[in-house]
């Protein structure tokens, strides 16, 4: 082998010339004590609140308590490999997550790392998880419908784009099913609707079983809805800081769409578990407990999260982020601490009841206790025209039904009211995974409030509805198209709709 001295000396001179003198300076501290997912660290004098710090082995944490002599750090992950005396390094960055369309169709953890085994996510942007909500000036009042595909909700408790509508109820009452159906209902718009109408969906699973989350993802995948959805999962086996962070991470991912003039929907399932995780962190950080041992700022925890859902005005891109937070109650107790907090923050609630669920009324929405504080401004005119009377009729029906239990001799008007109410209640039932388009809901409810169901036995209402829908999709397609494009029922359309339902009703008998 031929070694040339001149060549070697040239290489060495080049290496020496390019040798950098600047040392890499990073501020470090020492772990004083560690346990229960909390580390006390000495020496990080300039650390910021909410800053990400790094432990040996790549484990990350977030500085939450900045005290006189040490820093309380919550650890994202297991604290098993961290020991006293370990070096902790500042990263200089407040906790952030990747955002953008690259996340669609993926399942990520609270820090935005993929957990679905489909390879890395090459997101071009990152954003902080905890940012300030839009102020009053950039907002606009909610005026576009956010269709859930569920008759009971779209007709009676309409949700608009940019609204925060709480889904509240005991365990096993169908809270997650409402969010799932709402996500599935967006598929038709994503397949062949205009870009401006598309609704991108984020689903945050907090403290749930992994099997439940896997099932949710499987349903979305099978029905082609995962392509426009992001799943953020902090399951029951994840550390409390991850469960605390997941809703904020999901919200940031949804805000990307809101701020780029698009529409997004986020479901937090559920915020009771986030509050429990936050309580655990706060108590371990020795913050003083308040009511039900929750820290004093648990209201602020949820208010700053839910205030980020907003409808922006045209100068700011006219985007929106709609939130569907879920709260699980114990024994229908809506007056507990966390439920009352979230009810007071949101723009209405969908109240689900165990009794209704077991009576076979599903979705088990208690129409009397559920409200939407945005109301009919979140409905198209056609829906307002047909659903206006159904609310009053159902309210009267509930009132009468309570008295009718005691009296046997009822006058004809009361009997008529009870019959109509029973059929309307039956009409609002809907099987899971079968969301309806708005114009189809309008046709079905129109049949209900115009007396087409009154002669039918209650048991046949569901069959009539299914038959009517398939008839309208084939024979009455023109009427449905008119309702969809005009978004209102003119006298002409009304006559055509009546005729179509009439001709079906004759063949049904």
From Swiss-Prot:
Entry EC number(s): 7.1.2.2
Keywords: ATP synthesis, ATP-binding, Cell inner membrane, Cell membrane, CF(1), Hydrogen ion transport, Ion transport, Membrane, Nucleotide-binding, Translocase, Transport
Site (Required for activity): 370
Subcellular location: Cell inner membrane
Membrane topology: Peripheral membrane protein
Gene Ontology MF annotations: ADP binding; ATP binding; proton-transporting ATP synthase activity, rotational mechanism
Top-level taxon: Bacteria
InterPro entries in the cross-refs: ATP_synth_asu-like_sf, ATP_synth_asu_C, ATP_synth_asu_C_sf, ATP_synth_F1_a_nt-bd_dom, ATP_synth_F1_asu, ATPase_a/bsu_AS, ATPase_F1/V1/A1_a/bsu_N, ATPase_F1/V1/A1_a/bsu_N_sf
Cystine pairs: none
Key word Membrane present: yes
Enzymatic class: translocase
Binding site for ATP: 169-176
Function text: Produces ATP from ADP in the presence of a proton gradient across the membrane. The alpha chain is a regulatory subunit.
NCBIfam families registered for this protein in UniProt: atpA, PRK13343.1
Full protein name: ATP synthase subunit alpha
Species name: Sinorhizobium medicae (strain WSM419)
Classification lineage: Bacteria, Pseudomonadati, Pseudomonadota, Alphaproteobacteria, Hyphomicrobiales
